Each structure stands twice: as structure tokens, then as C-alpha cells.
Amino acid sequence: MRIIVAGGDGFCGWPTALYLSKQGHEVTIVDNLVRRKYDAELRSNSVTPIATLDERVAKWKELTGKEIKTFIGDLNHYDFLSEVFRQTEPEAFVHFAEQRSAPYSMIDREHAVYTQSNNVIGNLNVLFAIKEHAPDCHLIKLGTMGEYGAPNIDIEEGYIEIEHKGRKDRLPYPKQPGSFYHLSKVHDSHNIMFACKIWGIRATDLNQGIVYGLHTDETELDPVLYNRVDYDGVFGTALNRFLIQSAIGHDLTVYGAGGQTRAFLNIKDTVRCIEIAANNPADKGEFRVFNQFTEYFSVKDLAERVQRVAGEMGLSANIAHIENPRIEAEEHYYHAVNTNLRDLGLEPNLLTDDVLKGILQVALEYKDRVIEENVLPTVSWK
């Protein structure tokens, strides 16, 4: 299958491109390399050293004999995107190419506007490119479980059956996003659903949980293929931050009470979910939603697990509750449905102590690269 991976230089996109290439697909990466520029802007970095995209794809070809084509450019530039479609004739378009950080979107007006314009307009361009150049192409779009928020009822997969004043209907599940970033994903979902209805586009919206882990079988082949490990208060997840904090002897900083509960999955499951969606495409005109996660944990749960694992590795990790920079419920109900991908064959890789120890070991190996002041939050929602 001819597959474009947009955002293929990023944390989810890079291992996905390698995995799909290994499975025999003809993979093309489209990326504007802006994720690397965010590091410069924020004076941050990945704990693991990251090779250039050219070095990465060259090493992959050297090791496997498989070629991954690359196009460097922005989805917001429609002429560029159209040319990519004309040259590659994609059968599937995997869309990771969006600004993905809630804190980044909340820095100030400029970052909020950038996040919304970059994400929403880029996604609209993809929809028009499919319509005009590859109408049978299957859009596999990375959404987020954060679109739903934390409602006091079970979270269904995209749609909900409701009864109101004696009438019933199946409607899109209500959205309660918690940042301008999450709002951009909601706008994307609405635009994709509309395009499917009027143009007959086939699309799968993958509402992904928070991704953890470092290596897939492919990235582990050589240090040049290593994936990112972000730990700062803008792009780092709570789990990564706790692991890096324990590696450098810093308190594990839990925001507020720590009862905030979110969905999670291993990076190995991310790449497998993309493959499942590609091999089982949506029907023409269908807007399909899968909740892409395997487990959920509270922030406090994660801190306690990291504390215990760190202790087993001879590290002392103290848990400290700090003021929450976000506007969010710190204790709430959370139960979400995730049956569609399992029904199609997903066999989850769960968050085990061995997984935590593996990431922590890498953090210890590269702890001299950690910029200590970046492990604390710098962005406030208030």
C-alpha cells in the first residue's frame, strides 16, 4: 500500500513510518521539521539524542534495504501538498502533522492562534487534497481522547445514542476539550465528518490516549533510529516527567491532588493501531471513530508506580504535590470504551514495571542531557 505519514519525523510518526515500511508498504514521510524548532524556541531537548531525518532514513535503508521517501514542507501550503499527492498517489494518509501540546497552545494568544490555524487549516488542506487528487485515499487522522474531557458518564467511541422528549438519535459524542490544542482536534473531527458526508471521503479518527514508551522493534535497531523522549513541562507527559525527575534526583511533581485520570497506550500499540486502521479501511463516506488506548491511570497512580520502580533501582523519589497550572477537575469519574481496535486484533502492550524500568534506564544513561529547570511547569491556564 502507498502510505503517506505526515509528521513522520515526530514521536509517533517516526516509529509508525518504520513499522509500516517493515511490513512492506511504500512509505512517504511529509514533515516541516517544526518539532525540532520548538525545542530551540523552548530551550529544551529530547533526553535521547535525535539524528536528522536524512540520517534516519539513510540508516533505515542501510539496515533493511527499504527506502522511505521524504518531502520537507508544510501542510498549510496547498500547492506543496498537492504536488506530494500527485507524485505519490497515496492509498492511505496517516495524519500526525499537528502541534500536539496543550501547554504550548496555552502560552499566550500567539501560540493559541498558531495551534488552531496550523492544525485546522492543515487538516482542511488534507481533506481537499484527498477530494481533488486521491478520492479513494483513506484518511487515518490522529485525534485525542482529550476531545471528550472527563464527563460524568461513560465515554463511547465517537457517537452516543440519546433519547430526548420521546425521540431517539445517534449523535456525535459531546466534546469538552481542556485547551486550545484539544479544541483544534475537535474542529478537525467536525471538518472530517462533514467532508465524509458531502464528498464521500473515507476516514478513521483515532482518539488516542497519552503515549508512553521509547522503543519499538524498529527504532531499537540502531541509535540513529532512536525516538524522542520529551520531559519538559510543555511537551513532556506526566509519566515521562516523573521518570526523568527520578533519574536526576528531583521530586516527582504531581499537579494538585493527582486524581486527574487519563487514557494511555504504549508506542508499540500506536504503530499497530495505525496498521490495523490501514488494513481495515473505513467505507466510502464513513467517518469512523476509534478510541485508541489500552489502560487508564490517575496522575497520582503514575507517580506512585514510578516511585516504587525507582526505589527498586536504588533511587530515592519523593512525591510532591504542587499547584496545578491547569484548569481541570482533579477528582472525577472516568470510564471509556475501547472495543473497536481490540475487535480488529489489537493485543495490548501494558504498562509493566519492566517498561518503566526500561525508560528509566535510558533516562539514567542520558541524564546529563536533562535541563533541570525544564522539569517544572512554566505555562499557566489562568
List the predicted regions and their residue ranges.
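Short-chain dehydrogenase/reductase
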Residues: 123, 127, 192, 239, ...
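Hydrophobic alpha-helix immediately C-terminal to the catalytic Tyr-X-X-X-Lys motif of short-chain
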Residues: 187-195, 242, 302, 306
